[in-house]
Amino acid sequence: MKQSWLPMAALLAFGAVAASAEEVRVYNWSDYIDEELLAKFEAETGYDLVYDVFDSNEVLETKLLAGGSGYDVVVPTGTFLQRQIQAGAFQPLDYSKLPNSGNLWDVIKDRTAQYDPDNAYSINYMWGTTGIGVNVGKVAEVLGADAPINSLALVFDPANMEKLASCGVHFLDAPTEIIPAALAYIGEDPDSKDPEVLAKAEEALMAVRPYIQKFHSSEYINALANGEICVAFGWSGDILQARDRAAEADNGVDVAYNAPTEGALMWFDQMAVPVDAPNVEGAHAFLNFIMDANNMAAASNYVYYANGNKASQEFLIEDVIGDTAIYPDEATLANLYTVTPFDAGVQRTVTRLWTKVKSGQ
């Protein structure tokens, strides 16, 4: 879901207006890479790297569809990637310049092909699930030892949420993640595009809206790690980062992540090259660098997300490859679902719905 490299972000804020042939510009999610890899890329390739970050697919999509973003590599989630490909936002990859693509994992390539047929425009960077992060001790204090921490009822049952509000609840600011979860909770198809069914999701969300402290797609990491909140509905790797930050701080906060038993969204973040990328050669150099098995393992070992690189698995630390919250077992995989993009009409409905939910009015 991711570490911003501030020196590179500063270059965007204060630096070059036009990209040079020796400069590669990457736009990725915040807190999503080991910054040592960024310096390594520069040292190995001779390119100057400008690395900027974002916190929502909507922000990225606005830049892409407006054109002239100035980026060479961007990282949309699969559902957004699909409609961006259809809109002509990306150029096909030249796999002759990507020899490390042989390291990619067929299992993940098969799944990402639903968004990008033949994986012609993108490679998988990371994948994971969306679920529930809890401060185990605080939730037990509020709801008791039998609190349903592995169920969507924890965050969608108003009786639970009213109590949890006392210790703080954050939700992702991501309608494409939260609405499917609400639908799964009420027993509807998480991928439904039916306006009447989406209205039911709105009702479920509005019922718990008074108890949600904040909608944000990255702040919950530190808030959960520091004990400022007790529940976050967020991305698997972010919550596991919060767990590890709490452990490193030795602050007594015990963070746990669970994919809901009712089903969890499986998402894929894909690296792609915009159609108007200033440095296509540099973009391919960056993609090939990332697909190196050791480099991809270093990224996953840092952010605690699974990746689509089979060759990297021998270099993953046991805390990553051996954790079923990151690399799910077959039973968990069978309970994961994926969703398809909203068309323009449904997107307008969802935008209105989400605006209402966030405002609480």
What spans do the regions from the language model cover?
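Early extracytoplasmic/lumenal segment of secretory-pathway proteins
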Residues: 22-84
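Extracytoplasmic ligand-binding site segments that recognize negatively charged/polar headgroups
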Residues: 75, 81, 85-211, 218-225
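A ligand-binding cleft/hinge motif common to bilobed small-molecule-binding domains
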Residues: 80-83, 231-252
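Short beta-strand->loop
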Residues: 91-102, 249-265, 274-277
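A bilobed periplasmic-binding-protein/Venus flytrap-type ligand-binding module shared by bacterial periplasmic
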Residues: 133-138, 184-187, 267-279, 298
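Periplasmic-binding protein-like
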Residues: 198-207, 213, 251-272
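Conserved C-terminal helix/tail region of periplasmic/extracytoplasmic solute-binding proteins
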Residues: 222, 330-361
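Mature extracytoplasmic/periplasmic domains
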Residues: 274-335
